[in-house]
Amino acid sequence: MKITNLLMDIDEYLKGILWQILDSYKILAELDDTTNGLDIIKKQTSKINGLLQVINNKLNEKRYQSDHLVTLRKLSKYYITTYDYSREIEYVLEIYSDDPNRIKNLRILIINSLNDRRMIEKIQNILDEI
């Protein structure tokens, strides 16, 4: 009974975080490629990275061994260690902030990275499960 309550609590906690990640992804996917869009890209990627770090830290404990929690931990750890666009975003902000093609390419690169290992799809599936 205690383990079931623990899993229900962590699932509710993660549900809010996962919805925030999906909301940020949707914002990035629908964004205009303007200078204002670049500021939004910076904010949303920072938010996603922070939320994935929270998931990774929270699920790093051995007591969370259900399939969807292990999947989330692996996905978040992979993304955090593989992708960091902060330098590229700052570079585009400083030099190419008026170039919609560079902004679009950066945005598409970030969206593609979020779809690496089907992360967004798996997050949606996990939300359907819990």
List where the protein language model places each region.
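Long, low-complexity or tandemly repetitive, helically biased scaffold regions used
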Residues: 1-130
